[in-house]
A protein has these predicted regions:
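Long, low-complexity intrinsically disordered regions
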Residues: 1-174
């Protein structure tokens, strides 16, 4: 499975679930029957891959973390229109809550329900996703497909976080 991941370099995480969630399917087509838990173990126990936004939410080899640093430094572009001073303060408070109280999913953090946009995400979910897109939070694990966020410092080894990022053009070439 690791060789397949190394060849593909990213696997889109998808909630589509006809037979199994779509991100398990590339391995069936390449490896034949396999234990689906293997991908989850590589992501959440062994940290061979991690979750981050590439074009979509993806599993990416941890060895490629520095290739996405430029994206995390600027965050996702769709966040910028939501950054009022009030929102910035709330986003910071959500990060601090996770830092102080430990891993959390959106439903465990109080916040207003969302509007029709952003899949009706709560304000807490938007804040968690904002911090995740900027690399301050990482996905520690998933429960019933829901992300459990923790501060990146507790999810990844320090040398991963300290590795300098690539320039955007260089990262794209890789």
């Amino acid at each position: 499975m690791r060789r397949t991941i190394d060849r593909l370099r990213l696997i889109q995480i998808d909630s589509v679930n006809v037979l199994v969630r779509a991100h398990y399917m590339p391995f069936f087509s390449r490896l034949g029957p396999y234990r689906r838990e293997m991908l989850d173990e590589l992501a959440y126990r062994d940290r061979y891959v991690f979750e981050q936004w590439a074009h979509e939410a993806c599993f990416i080899p941890l060895a490629d973390y520095s290739l996405l640093r430029h994206r995390m430094d600027r965050g996702r572009r769709w966040h910028s229109r939501h950054l009022t001073a009030e929102r910035q303060a709330y986003f910071a408070s959500v990060l601090e809550k996770v830092r102080e109280e430990g891993p959390a999913q959106a439903g465990e953090i109080e916040g207003k329900r969302g509007s029709k946009g952003w899949w009706e995400w709560s304000h807490a979910k938007v804040a968690l996703e904002y911090q995740f897109a900027h690399g301050r939070l990482a996905v520690k694990e998933r429960r019933n497909f829901a992300r459990i966020y923790d501060v990146a410092d507790r999810v990844f080894d320090p040398q991963v976080l300290e590795t300098p990022g690539h320039a955007e053009a260089d990262a794209h070439r890789e």
